[in-house]
Amino acid sequence: MKKIYIYLAICAALCACGENPTLDMAGMFSPQGPTIKTRFDHSMAYNEKVGEIHLDMQQDNYIVYTCADSHINKAHRNLAYFINQYEAETSPKIAIHLGDLIDAQYNFAEADSVLQLGGRSIEDTLFITPGNHDIYFYQWDIYRSYYKTSVYWFDTNNGSKKLDLFICLDSADGELGNKQVNWLKDLLADKADDGYRHIIVFTHTHLWKLDMSQGHTSNFALESTYELTSILGQYGVDYVWGGHQHARQLVEYNGVTYMAIDATKDQESNQAYMIANIGDKITYDYPDYPKVSE
């Protein structure tokens, strides 16, 4: 009986927050929008329409600026700093955001005012993968109105010389779904003989659960982790970059290096981004965001 009273008290407290537009009571018991199958189908349709993305870096070495978990609401100091640093970089470069761009509903316009990516095109060099906060509350249609696709690949080259393959996976639900897994296997098999230096997969949800920072959403189901790590190891993937944990992590397994990076969210305890120096080898720096006195 005591447990029932506690449960009712929690429900009453949540219902009392009904005017909060970021609280979706129905979403506690039902899906938060289109399933990964639908998002995958939408993404494939867009990818087929715009064609493949091949980026000529003009040289063999270049830089990848990478951030995660900016959780934009009305505060975007760190994300603005990241974009400013990226734009000031004079070396050949691309940038990747590893998801949870926004914190809750109605924040995409605010985030895009910083990214200035509205109506993303294949000429852009800033790439995004969705996080759970970007998809929750039935926001997929809004997300894709800005960023168009959540599952895609691109590669880099120096003229006719192929360099590196990047693959973006949609793990916003903490799963990939059968269609996306099969697409990944087919893509890796098709590219196996193309001679890439590095194959880098990037996605939001980290594959390895090293803490409970994100509760039950921390990573994939055990069966999915086993399947994905087997595929990634089998087809020669070198790195998997992720976020979601809000803390830096590194795991090496079956020939693949799995990396999670710190958060870009303002006021987070771990505030840093990653600069990957891509060449025959990859080295990493983790600059902190500037501290702001209270």
Where would I find each of the regions flagged by the language model?
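His/acidic metal-ligating clusters that form di-metal
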Residues: 85-94, 121, 175-258, 282-285, ...
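Binuclear metal-dependent phosphoesterase catalytic core
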Residues: 21-43, 248-294
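N-terminal active-site segment of His-dependent metallophosphoesterases
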Residues: 18-109
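Sec-dependent signal peptide recognition
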Residues: 2-9
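C-terminal motif of bacterial Sec signal peptides marking the signal peptidase cleavage site
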Residues: 13-16
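Beta-strand-turn-beta hairpins that frame and shape the catalytic cleft
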Residues: 52-65, 153-167, 195-198, 252-258, ...
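Core catalytic region of metal-dependent phosphoesterases/phosphodiesterases
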Residues: 78-156
